[in-house]
Amino acid sequence: MLLTLLKCKLHKATVTHSELEYEGSCAIDGDLLDAAGILPYEQIQIYNIANGERFTTYAIRAEAGSRVISVNGAAAHKANPGDRVIICAYGQLPREEAARFHPRLVYLDADNRIVRTGSDIPVQAA
């Protein structure tokens, strides 16, 4: 049996552009893609902290160092510049591998600079 797990995430990215007329997808700074391990054209889930929208699209590479997060095409209706979002990619692993797997977690500031990385989400206190 394969289990679907969080592969990686960009936590609290700031949307810099929202381009309705662009050909779909989400353009992400190439350095951020590399840090998270997200490949161009890989399916991603985007969770908009500002408005609660959750949607699926795919990643495309924006210029490295640009700090761009551009939500494009129809998805542009779901995010505006300045919105904070969580961008996740998932993978499937056999149960035995899943038990040992740790995701790549990349935490960003409001300017889409990496402030820290990790591989475990802390236990949530009651």
UniProtKB/Swiss-Prot annotation:
Gene Ontology CC: cytosol
| Gene Ontology terms for molecular function | aspartate 1-decarboxylase activity
Entry's transmembrane regions = none
Pathway as given in its UniProt record = Cofactor biosynthesis; (R)-pantothenate biosynthesis; beta-alanine from L-aspartate: step 1/1
Primary subcellular site in the record, as a coarse category: cytoplasm
Q: Which cofactor does it need?
A: pyruvate
Write out the similarity annotation. Answer: Belongs to the PanD family.
Q: How does it assemble?
A: Heterooctamer of four alpha and four beta subunits.
Q: Name it.
A: Aspartate 1-decarboxylase
Give the organism the record lists. Thioalkalivibrio sulfidiphilus (strain HL-EbGR7)
